[in-house]
Amino acid sequence: MTFHKLTMVLAGLALATVSASGAFATDTKLGVVAKIGGIPWFNAMEAGIEERAKELGVEAYMIGPTSADAALQVRAIEDLIARGVTAIGVVPNDAEALEPVLAKARSKGIKVITHESPAQKNVDWNFEMTSAKEFGEAHAELLAEMSGGRGEYAVFVGSLTVPLHNAWADSAIAHLKKNYS
C-alpha cells in the first residue's frame, strides 16, 4: 500500500469513527494534531485528510505544531475543543502529557482518535499501521543481516515519550537478544 493510499484509508477511518450511523452529517468537523508540522510525512497525511474530507463533504483539517513539543499539542487540542469539533485525531509527542486534555475533550462528547499511542487511556480508538512487534523484529533482522549477526549496535527512537517508537525498539532488542546473543 502506498503512503498516499494509507493516508486516505486512515483519514476515511477517522472520519467514519465520528458517525455512529455511518452517514456523515454536514456539520462533522475533525481536527487532527500532528507531532510537528511542515515535514513530508505529515504533509502527506494532511493532503490525504483534506482530500477525503472533500469527498465526504465534511470539514477536516490538520494542525502541526512548530516543534515536537507536547505543550504545543495540548494548546492545539484545547483550541479544537473551543472550536467545537466533532472529533480530534492526534499523533502524540508525549502520551502521558496529553491524558488530561484528551479526557477533557471526551467529557465534552468529542470523539478522540490516536495513532502511535497504543496504551493511550482517554481515546475512543487508536490505530496502528502495523504490529509493533513485527515491525521491530523486521528491522532487527535487517540489522542482523547487514552485520552478519554479530557486533554492537545502538538504538535510536524518534522520542522517548512516544510509546510506539519504544515498542518498536523493545521488540527489536528482544529479537536480537533471543536470536543473536
Feature locations, PLM:
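N-terminal signal peptide c-region/cleavage motif recognized by signal peptidases
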Residues: 19-20
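A residue-level marker of the well-folded mature domains of exported/periplasmic proteins
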Residues: 3-11, 23-181
